[in-house]
Design a protein with these regions (language model features):
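Amphipathic alpha-helical "stem/stalk" segments
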Residues: 1-83
Length: 83
């Protein structure tokens, strides 16, 4: 439905922005405090099952290094929530 389409578009845009920040960090253009804040915020987004479902659908459209980064953060979140 339309609401789901809007949510998918919104979440996809957020992930694209995070991918850009990941790239900027990898080339030394992003302040470490800004990076840490982004990672913390991103891990919160990745704790939502709906967002994980969307990620599984859109992840092939991202660079492999970013996919690995996101998958690592998802695993960290799963470990955290199990403790």
């Amino acid at each position: 439905d339309e609401e789901e389409s809007i949510y998918l578009t919104h979440f996809s845009a957020i992930v694209r922005a995070r991918q850009n920040q990941h790239y900027q960090h990898s080339i030394g253009m992003l302040d470490e405090n800004e990076w840490n804040a982004m990672v913390s915020s991103f891990k919160t987004l990745l704790s939502d099952p709906k967002n994980l479902e969307i990620w599984s659908f859109i992840s092939p459209t991202f660079p492999k290094d970013f996919v690995n980064f996101v998958d690592e953060k998802i695993k960290e979140g799963q470990i955290y929530t199990k403790n």
